[in-house]
């Protein structure tokens, strides 16, 4: 598998919608396929449900990695880490993204839709996907 042809599962709740759409664009620009388990609306969504679907896709090897977005990223991280074989990392900066891959072999990236701006999202996702 080349680093440029991964299947990336995406999931978000209502608070992570805008950030998920930004992440989806970044993932596509980097040449990866997106499998979207998240919501496309602003109505309330139970984050554990969508986190589980995306994490299960990684666990079953239907996706190579996953990126999950909710308000803080904490809930998605907790929910995803309940799935066997998943190593979800909540990352708020570039160093977290790099270390989570290099030292922890994370296969799920959890992000905050409320706390991260577009530039930070881009850098974190790019580093995490290329490390």
Model-predicted segments: where are they?
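Mid-chain, well-packed structural core segment of small domains
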Residues: 68-69, 74-114
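Short, Lys/Arg-enriched N-terminal segments with co-localized hydrophobic residues
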Residues: 1-5
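Short, solvent-exposed amphipathic alpha-helices that sit
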Residues: 18-30
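A short beta-strand-loop structural module common to alpha/beta enzyme folds
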Residues: 33-44
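Short, structured active-site "lid" loops
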Residues: 50-72
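Short active-site oxyanion
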Residues: 7-8, 63-66, 85-87
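C-terminal binding/interaction regions
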Residues: 9-18, 94-131
């Amino acid at each position: 598998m080349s680093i440029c042809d991964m299947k990336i599962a995406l999931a978000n709740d209502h608070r992570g919608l805008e950030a998920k759409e930004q992440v989806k664009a970044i993932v596509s620009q980097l040449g990866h396929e997106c499998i979207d388990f998240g919501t496309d609306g602003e109505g309330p969504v139970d984050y554990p449900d969508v986190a589980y679907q995306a994490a299960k896709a990684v666990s079953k090897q239907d996706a190579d990695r996953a990126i999950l977005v909710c308000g803080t990223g904490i809930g998605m991280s907790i929910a995803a880490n309940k799935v066997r074989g998943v190593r979800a990392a909540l990352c708020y900066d570039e160093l977290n993204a790099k270390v989570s891959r290099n030292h922890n072999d994370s296969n799920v990236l959890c992000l905050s839709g409320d706390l991260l701006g577009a530039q930070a999202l881009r850098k974190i996702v790019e580093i995490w996907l290329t490390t």
